Amino acid sequence: MSNTPRNINDVFTRVVSVPASQIDLLSASLLIAAREYPDMDIVAERGRVALLGERVRKRLRRRHGLYDAVHAVNEVLFNDLGIRGDKKRYHDPRNSYIPNVLDRGLGNPITLSVLYVEIASRAGYRFHGIGLPGHFLVRAGEGSESIYVDPFDVGGLLSRRECIAIVQRAIGKPDRKSVPMSVDEAAPFMRPTGKRAILRRTLSNLKQIYLEKEDYARALQVAEGIRTVEPTSWHNLADLARIQTELGRFNAAAETLSTYLARAPRGHELESARAALSELRNRVIRKRESGPGTDAAGTGGPVGESPRNQ
């Protein structure tokens, strides 16, 4: 019998509807996977991560330094389990689901980083995810003692200057190679990423993947998840309205666009949004005039078979 709750969306809402610092990141991440794999056993998956943390703890024994901890996590994840960053199929959605990462041994930067942080936590160490533009790392330690780890590159260590170079390349200033970005300029990009932001970034990656595949049913699930994590995200509301329209859910799309217009910054494609809202309302009127019927049922259940190990 599965230990995954039937009302996954309700449980996910409860898990993320607390102050960001109190969010159980592993539970929330597993619930994201459970929306795709409703037969997944969340208790068992938590147990897998706990066992990995215990293996790290045993490796450390009497050693307690940060480098010792990083080395131990690296050994367990990348040597024992053989986990790697998926550089061939980077945008495979399975790379975003922790159970898939453990099953297949492949993941993307943010999911590998979440797994890294959660394993370290269960071994007694507080590491942080660092969401650089275009990449995701793990930081062990604080201030000048910080160690930067790249789980996507089998736990390779990076200097602060190498991290700054990643930021500089990502924000489009390659012309400044001869004038490197300063530590102060890069500092806002190198702060620990909050749990809510990590979840939003994970879901945003998935949303983009499904939109590119034109898999609007799955994209809808993910966009609804982002709305749960960050209800005020106007960018996600715009995407959500588009997805609802693609699925023929014109009433829902009109409501979403109305909310978007109330929240989006002035001048941000508001005229096109107003035109889209007017067209949606006309569609709703025509639909009512043509006969009974409502928008398709809401989300909440599985959106199709997607074997974890195919």
What are these regions (language model features)?
Residues 1-310:
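A structural boundary/capping signal
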